[in-house]
Amino acid sequence: DFIGITLQYEMCYTNILQLLDLSQVTLLSKDRGEDEPIVMGGGPCSYNPEPVADFFDIFYMGEGETEFYHLLDLYKENKKNGGTRKEFLEMAAEIPCMYVPAFYDVTYNEDCTIKEMVPNNPHAKGGVRKDIVLDFDKVEYPEKPLVEVQRGCIRECRFCQAGSVYKPLREKSLEKLKYLATTMLKTTGQEEISLSSLSTSDYSHLKELIDFLIEECK
């Protein structure tokens, strides 16, 4: 029912068209029929969606843990009630972090920057808000032995897209990381884990965490 595509960097844009073509999905969103999947984009490049907006039904702005299940519940409800594709997109458009390109008329300046975005559907918002997870202790990788220690970065380097996209910096508590690490080692069969973030060395309790892991993994 859905095709979800993570837009990690602009060089993958041609792969999007190839993916849709090989899947026998109509390339342009406006031409898709009722029986075709909803094509949804997310990830860093979704913050500048217009170059590929014609190929997507929905862009998810922000972190998937916040509204993804809500979106799926709306889809199930619409399908159960015999609703149309457009009716589901209208329901999705009311979620603050969902951008439905078909519901906006976009005009451009001569240099191809956006001049104006005007909603053309009453369910579309005047603006789309990025959603983030506020309580980072509630976020975890359910399957991989990968511990995300923090999201965001304190460095704020001007050249770094990820540093801007994943603002603000949010750390997991030391006790939560200890629990995740020991649980993953006991339940996955893996003998090692990875600490993941944009800049793990900046985690404020890194020494205590490393000392704990050294003892735990002996």
Regions found by a protein language model. Name each.
Residues 2-118:
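Glycine-rich beta-alpha loop elements in corrinoid/cobalamin-binding modules
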Residues 3, 36-40, 55, 82, ...:
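Generic preference for well-ordered secondary structure
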Residues 5-7, 24-28, 34, 122-127, ...:
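Generic detector of short, locally flexible boundary/turn motifs and exposed helical patches
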